UniProtKB/Swiss-Prot annotation:
Residues 354-365 have a biased composition (Polar residues). It comes from Arabidopsis thaliana. Keywords: DNA-binding, Nucleus, Transcription, Transcription regulation. This is Transcription factor bHLH68. It is found in: Nucleus. Residues 224-235 have a biased composition (Basic and acidic residues). The keyword DNA-binding applies.
Length: 407
C-alpha cells in the first residue's frame, strides 16, 4: 500500500498542477490548440520551467520510481480506463517489448502529458520561428543601415546560437529538454538569447558609434587643422607675395614736401625765364629754348665788352695783343646786329689796338709800373676815351676840356 501511495503521489501532483492535457485521459477530449499564426498566450505563473520542462520526456527504461510493477499495477488498472490510441506511446511500448495491459493510470497520464508537451513544443517551434523571422528582419534593417554593424552582430548572434545549440544537444543527450533552439517555451531562455543578441547588437552599434565618433573626432582634428591651415596658407601666400614684392624694386614715391618743393622750384624757374626773356628780347620768341639762346649771346657780348675795356691793363706784349684781336674777331659773330647801341665800331677797335700797342711800347721803355689789377677799373687811359668820344660823339666817356693824363 505504501508503494501505491508513493505511485499516486506524482499523479496527484500533476492533477494539482492543472495541466490541460489531462483531458486525454478523462474523456478523450482536449482543448483546441491556439492558432499557428498568432502568438502564444503567456504562461501562468505555476507553469514554471521547473514544473514543466525539467521532467523526463522519453526514458529509455521503465520508470522505476514513478511507475509500478506489473503485479501491483493490475489492482489499480481495473479502475482505470482503457489505453488510449497514442501512436507514440504504442511505438515506445513495442520498442521496449512491454504489453500495454501492464501500465497503470499514472503511465497513461504521463503519456498524455508527453503528447501535450510535444504539441506545445511544436507550437513553441513555430513561435520561435516567428521570433527568428522578426529578429532576422531587425538584422536586415541593421544590415541596410550599416553593413559592418550587421556583419559583427550576425557573427556574434551565430556564435551565441551555436553555443545554445551545443547546450541543447548536450541536454537532449542527457534526456532533458532545457534550452533547445527549436523549442523556446522557456521565456528566460528566449529573453536571454534575444537580450544577448540585442546586447551584442547594441555593443556593436556602440562600438561602431565609438568608431564613428573617433573618426568624426579624427575628422574634427583634420577639420580643425584645416580651419587652422587656411590662415597658415594665406600667411604663406602673403609671405610669398611680400617676398616677391621685396624682390621687386620698390617705386620711389616722393614725399609731399619734396613734391611741394619741386612745384615751388618749377614756378620759380618759370618766373626767372620770363624775367630773362624781358631782359634779352622782349619782342622776340617766348619759348624757353629761344630765350636761353638769346641770353647766352647777350652774355658773350658783355664779356667781349669787358675784355675790350680792360685790355690796356692786361696786355703787355704784341703777342698778347694779337691773341686779343683774334679773340675779339671770334666773338663778333656772337654780337647781335639788331642791337645797334651795343655794337662797337671796327675802326675804334683798330685804333684802340694801335693806341694800346703804342702805350705798351712807352710803358716798356719807361720804368715798369705797378699792376693796376688790384685797383679795378677806376683808372682809364685818356687815349681810349678820346677815341671813343671822337668817333661816336654821344659817349659819356668824353674827357673834360683842357685835361690831360688820367682822371
Amino acid at each position: 500500500m505504501n508503494r501505491g501511495v508513493l505511485e499516486s503521489s506524482p499523479v496527484q501532483q500533476l492533477m494539482a498542477a492543472g495541466n490541460p492535457n489531462w483531458w486525454n485521459v478523462s474523456g478523450g477530449m482536449r482543448p483546441p490548440p491556439p492558432l499557428m499564426g498568432h502568438q502564444q498566450a503567456p504562461l501562468p505563473p505555476h507553469m514554471t520551467p521547473n514544473n514543466n520542462y525539467l521532467r523526463p520526456r522519453m526514458m529509455p527504461t521503465p520508470f522505476p520510481h514513478f511507475l509500478p510493477s506489473p503485479a501491483t499495477s493490475s489492482s489499480s488498472s481495473s479502475s482505470s480506463p482503457s489505453l488510449p490510441n497514442n501512436p507514440n506511446l504504442s511505438s515506445w511500448l513495442e520498442s521496449n517489448d512491454l504489453p500495454p495491459e501492464s501500465w497503470s493510470l499514472s503511465q497513461l497520464l504521463l503519456g498524455g502529458l508527453m503528447m501535450g508537451e510535444e504539441e506545445r513544443l511544436e507550437m513553441m517551434n513555430h513561435h520561435n520561428h516567428h521570433d527568428e523571422q522578426q529578429h532576422h528582419g531587425f538584422q536586415g534593417k541593421i544590415r541596410l543601415e550599416n553593413w559592418e554593424e550587421q556583419v559583427l552582430s550576425h557573427q556574434q548572434a551565430s556564435m551565441v546560437a551555436v553555443d545554445i545549440k551545443q547546450e541543447g544537444n548536450i541536454n537532449n543527450n542527457n534526456g532533458y529538454v532545457i534550452s533547445s533552439p527549436n523549442s523556446p517555451p522557456n521565456k528566460s531562455c528566449v529573453t536571454t538569447t534575444t537580450t544577448t543578441s540585442l546586447n551584442s547588437n547594441d555593443d556593436n552599434i556602440n562600438n561602431n558609434n565609438n568608431m564613428l565618433d573617433f573618426s568624426s573626432n579624427h575628422n574634427g582634428l583634420h577639420l580643425s587643422e584645416g580651419r587652422h591651415t587656411p590662415p597658415d596658407r594665406s600667411s604663406e601666400c602673403n609671405s610669398l607675395e611680400i617676398g616677391g614684392s621685396t624682390n621687386k624694386k620698390p617705386r620711389l614715391q616722393p614725399s609731399p614736401s619734396s613734391q611741394s618743393t619741386l612745384k615751388v622750384r618749377k614756378e620759380k624757374l618759370g618766373g626767372r625765364i620770363a624775367a630773362l626773356h624781358q631782359l634779352v628780347s622782349p619782342f622776340g620768341k617766348t619759348d624757353t629754348a629761344s630765350v636761353l639762346s638769346e641770353a647766352i649771346g647777350y652774355i658773350r657780348f658783355l664779356q667781349s665788352q669787358i675784355e675790350a675795356l680792360s685790355h690796356p691793363y692786361f696786355g703787355t706784349t704784341a703777342s698778347g695783343n694779337m691773341r686779343h684781336q683774334q679773340h675779339l674777331q671770334g666773338d663778333r659773330s656772337c654780337i647781335f646786329p639788331e642791337d645797334p647801341g651795343q655794337l662797337v665800331n671796327d675802326q675804334c677797335m683798330k685804333r684802340r689796338g694801335a693806341s694800346s700797342s703804342s702805350t705798351d711800347n712807352q710803358n716798356a721803355s719807361e720804368e715798369p709800373k705797378k699792376d693796376l689789377r688790384s685797383r679795378g677799373l677806376c683808372l682809364v687811359p685818356i687815349s681810349c676815351t678820346l677815341q671813343v668820344g671822337s668817333d661816336n660823339g654821344a659817349d659819356y666817356w668824353a674827357p673834360a676840356l683842357g685835361s690831360a693824363g688820367f682822371h
